[in-house]
């Protein structure tokens, strides 16, 4: 679950809607609850390494994968076991194929054309480029039941929130179904799921 506060006494919980805030707990109170001994410094991950982690997670969860062909030779196989990527996207998305084929990682239901999750890794590119791709897809494909995630480092969260709250994304409904994943969360997810297999 992801929770955002827009600074105007409105609380947003991804995939749950907006609520008025009745109470407040300060960051210092939350900071006191964190066990500092359990914090780990992570390396600075590259765009390709994060793509590799997300692809590996999808593969381990049983999804078919799409990663743009020009990114595939940059995947970091020292970080994860090799996985297979589809060479073509489903023809049912032909009218918007030029948008979809640029999405950094797509999980598809195995053996089908159903898009289950999409990830845009925004390492140095503008945050809104991924949001605009998602918005185009969301508007062009009615009844799409997919998850949309912008993935970046924590430093870029505020940039995500400023773009995420633009009227175009609120009016389309994308702001209700899109979330932000930090690199550290992707890495933790990757480590957890790899241990289970």
Predicted regions span which residues?
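Catalytic cores of nucleic-acid endonucleases
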Residues: 92, 98-103, 112-176
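Active-site metal-binding core of divalent-cation-utilizing nuclease and nuclease-like domains
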Residues: 43, 59, 67-113, 194-195
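A structural signal for short, well-ordered beta-strand segments and their strand-loop junctions
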Residues: 2-5, 65-68, 150
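Internal, Lys/Arg-enriched amphipathic helical interaction segments that engage polyanionic partners
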Residues: 1-36
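Nuclease catalytic cores
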Residues: 26-70, 95-96
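Domain-level recognition of nuclease-like catalytic cores that cleave nucleotide substrates
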Residues: 11-16, 154-197
């Amino acid at each position: 679950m992801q929770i955002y506060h827009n600074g105007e006494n409105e609380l947003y919980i991804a995939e749950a809607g907006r609520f008025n805030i009745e109470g407040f707990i300060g960051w210092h109170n939350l900071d006191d609850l964190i066990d500092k001994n359990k914090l780990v410094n992570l390396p600075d991950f590259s765009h390709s390494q994060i793509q590799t982690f997300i692809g590996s997670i999808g593969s381990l969860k049983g999804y078919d994968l799409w990663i743009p062909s020009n990114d595939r030779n940059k995947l970091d196989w020292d970080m994860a076991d090799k996985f297979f990527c589809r060479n073509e996207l489903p023809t049912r998305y032909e009218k918007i194929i030029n948008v979809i084929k640029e999405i950094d990682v797509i999980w598809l239901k195995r053996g089908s054309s159903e898009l289950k999750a999409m990830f845009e890794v925004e390492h140095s590119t503008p945050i809104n480029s991924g949001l605009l791709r998602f918005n185009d897809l969301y508007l062009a494909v009615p009844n799409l039941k997919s998850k949309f995630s912008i993935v970046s480092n924590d430093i870029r969260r505020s940039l995500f929130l400023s773009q995420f709250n633009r009227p175009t994304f609120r009016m389309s409904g994308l702001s209700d179904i899109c979330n932000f994943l930090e690199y550290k969360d992707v890495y933790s997810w990757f480590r957890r799921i790899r241990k289970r297999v």
